[in-house]
């Protein structure tokens, strides 16, 4: 089935046509000066959804996510703490990978560190200087001359003539009001940088943030990428500058599809420490929420709309996951009768899968996909509720029906990454005790049924009697 994605470059939804196999995917990773916050993870969960959808549709994916371990913020942090850059960044790198696991985010194929690619960055800067595209400023930093790149502003759709343009800027982050030549190599300042610098033909210093991503992506994925994704804040200046650098070096189109997720708000406001609404994943885990609950909340809205993160939203995510957990537990009941997959169940499964795939291939419309999932759950629960456990008829919901649905749920969880499947099978000896208890109940031998219940509990399993039969769960 065709996949359609909204391309920031064209501002249109386009059919995805990869250049080759595998799909070359580059996503902006963390700047490891602190713990990643939930706004960062909104973007990372979106990028994970994108990757999962590609894999679900049968594409092979070569995914690279960078680790920015040298920039204004990391240098300031290391200097303040009085330690090496590596020692300062490593705890935050470790925490980032732990957070990825907690949120069920698939690992990338490579996580290049900016500090490992500085020789390649120096070589690229020299090439740009030789072409007359970059120059050494009076402050001994090296700058990219945006006037030498005619397509500058194409991604962010800037009208260069309407914007105030200054001569140059050496900060890593700035806004559109400061459109200017940007830094490729920041000259060493002992008062600012301490003892952290690299030698180069242009003098001591370190690379600019924008150059780092260009060099690492091209080193590991080649000169032209299929997809580059990140947050909307990265469009300008970061991704705009990446295009200018990369295409000046390669003389080839840098990226075919640009995807960007929108902002995350907290209680309707921009997240900030001063407002007291700044959360890391660790903060939420300490409040008693699970990684699955946080992932579900970050996942459920369309990536190109703002997501309002609230405590009420987390509670709603918890309830949604409970509904999913209860449904799966109901299907995992081992005491449905053996029978065929009934046409009504097969038809419901097929209709649901078609609706789910139609949604995710329409620019990753996960909210529509989740709506179809809960419609499906209501329909199947209705089928199970209608069955009569007293009459063994061919129309009764069967074990094969349940297994077919569970298989389908496992299939779509390749995209969602949140479904709570049971972690332990029920041992045969416990199943035998349950069957004996079921037989005792049918002949109204309540004393024996109670004894068998106690025996089952003693083996670490709970048993619930319901109108559709008995359910067994590990305690």
Swiss-Prot record:
CDD domains: CysRS_core. Keywords: Aminoacyl-tRNA synthetase, ATP-binding, Cytoplasm, Ligase, Metal-binding, Nucleotide-binding, Protein biosynthesis, Zinc. InterPro entries: Cys-tRNA-ligase, Cys-tRNA-synt_Ia_DALR, Cys-tRNA/MSH_ligase, CysS_C, Rossmann-like_a/b/a_fold, tRNA-synt_1_cat_dom, tRNAsynth_Ia_anticodon-bd. Its main location: cytoplasm. Pfam families: CysS_C, DALR_2, tRNA-synt_1e. GO terms for biological process: cysteinyl-tRNA aminoacylation. Its cofactor is Zn(2+). Gene3D superfamilies: Cysteine-tRNA ligase, C-terminal anti-codon recognition domain, HUPs. ATP binds at residue 273. A motif ('KMSKS' region) lies at residues 270-274. Zn(2+) binds at residues 28, 213, 238, 242. GO terms for molecular function: ATP binding; cysteine-tRNA ligase activity; zinc ion binding. It is found in: Cytoplasm. Monomer. Belongs to the class-I aminoacyl-tRNA synthetase family. This is Cysteine--tRNA ligase.
